[in-house]
Design a protein with these regions (language model features):
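Eukaryotic scaffold repeat domains enriched in small/polar residues
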Residues: 23-373
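Positively charged n-region of N-terminal signal peptides that target proteins for export
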Residues: 1-5
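Bacterial N-terminal signal peptides
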Residues: 6-16
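Sec/Tat signal peptide C-region and signal peptidase I cleavage site
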Residues: 18-22
Length: 373
């Protein structure tokens, strides 16, 4: 068994270094099995006949009985429907990300209960995605410090961020300008994510084209920004996700740069200081920060990775592509207050639920994000 583990570790080190970036290989740390069991076929279909889930790009577990989903429209199924169809496009070996001509802008936002059944369908907001030439919704978040539990939805393609009431009945705020990309204080260019500081400030990961993180005050007024395009300390080749941790720490995933950039807040609310970078990833996708560690998902190979705040790899488990329970991409993940894990697949087109194994080492379980519990 030991030679196989060593071989896997060597493979991970080899593929984790982005092309064109010469660097010392990063020790992978322990590699082992997932500490979770999948709840098979949890995400129950509710689309009209002829359609399936689209790319599940955003998942946020507000509670064990309310899981918010942002999906990139629905996927038009082939007709006649093959017998092997199992409730999601991936079961037909169809990739909802690459087969964009089958995308239909309907049921873009909805919620699920603990059993994976649809609770709310926010179809009144489908028009905010209609006509999009690209993937559209990218993340869905709620600030742990917001008593009103407003829902933030980032639309990458339209360069906009929408803030909804908790029940989805009202659109409270629109940031950015639809179809207008810009690098000034009022515009975005392919925004990707949003995070929240305890004092009410908001961090906008902006994004794939602007390569910056924008800082807003509690009233959503511009304060400052940090980052910039490049491979140097604190720069980005594309900010894909962002999260906040204790001690004023800010963790931003530099997707194309294959690293995590770490910053810290300062006494000046408009400025942060660069702390460190954690290199050696291929395409880091999403992040959850806990009290003393953080978890990310990475692509090529698809995996969950746990690190401490110094960047040391503490544990890794690989995510297989094999169906019925596999993934092509864990684009987003979330954990509820009961410790259940949810992972959205942007390519197979579904969200899966995982429960901790009875014999799991608790140190290997992902907890709800810092500040949320």
């Amino acid at each position: 068994m030991m030679p196989r583990i060593c071989a896997v570790a060597a493979l991970l080190i080899a593929v984790s270094i982005p092309a064109g970036r010469a660097q010392t290989p990063v020790p992978e740390g322990p590699i082992g099995p997932s500490p979770y069991n999948v709840v098979r076929a949890w995400h129950q279909p509710f689309a009209a006949p002829g359609f399936a889930f689209g790319g599940n790009s955003g998942v946020f577990a507000e509670s064990p009985d309310r899981i918010l989903i942002a999906q990139r429209g629905e996927f038009r199924l082939p007709d006649p429907l093959p017998a092997e169809y199992a409730g999601f496009a991936g079961s037909l070996k169809m990739n909802v990300l690459t087969l964009a001509d089958r995308r239909v802008w309907q049921n873009c936002l909805y919620t699920l209960d603990r059993n994976g059944r649809v609770k709310e369908r926010w179809t009144q907001w489908d028009h905010l995605c209609e006509g999009s030439p690209g993937p559209g919704p990218h993340r869905i978040r709620i600030s742990p410090y917001d008593r009103d539990k407003r829902v933030w939805v980032i639309n990458e393609t339209f360069n906009t961020i929408y803030v909804f009431s908790s029940d989805g009945k009202k659109l409270l705020k629109t940031l950015g300008e639809k179809n207008v990309a810009g690098s000034d204080r009022a515009h975005f260019a392919k925004p990707q994510d949003v995070a929240f500081l305890p004092d009410g400030r908001v961090l906008i990961a902006d994004g794939l084209d602007n390569h910056r993180v924008m800082i807003l005050d509690k009233d959503l007024n511009y304060l400052g920004e940090f980052g910039g395009n490049g491979k140097g300390p604190g720069q980005f080749s594309g900010v894909h996700a962002i999260a906040v941790g204790p001690g004023g720490r800010i963790f931003a995933l530099d997707r194309s740069g294959g690293r995590i950039n770490v910053f810290r807040t300062t006494k000046d609310p408009a400025k942060v200081e660069f702390v460190a970078e954690f290199p050696g990833f291929s395409l880091p996708l999403d992040i959850i920060v806990n009290d003393d560690s953080l978890w990310i998902t990475d692509l090529k190979p698809l995996r969950f990775v746990k690190l401490d705040f110094s960047g040391k790899r503490l544990y890794t488990w690989l995510v297989p592509p094999d169906l019925p329970d596999g993934y092509l991409e864990v684009h987003t993940f979330s954990v509820d207050s009961d410790g259940n894990l949810y992972g959205g697949d942007n390519q197979y087109g579904r969200t899966q639920k995982f429960v901790p194994r009875p014999d799991a080492d608790k140190a290997l379980l992902i907890r709800a994000p810092w500040g949320q519990r």
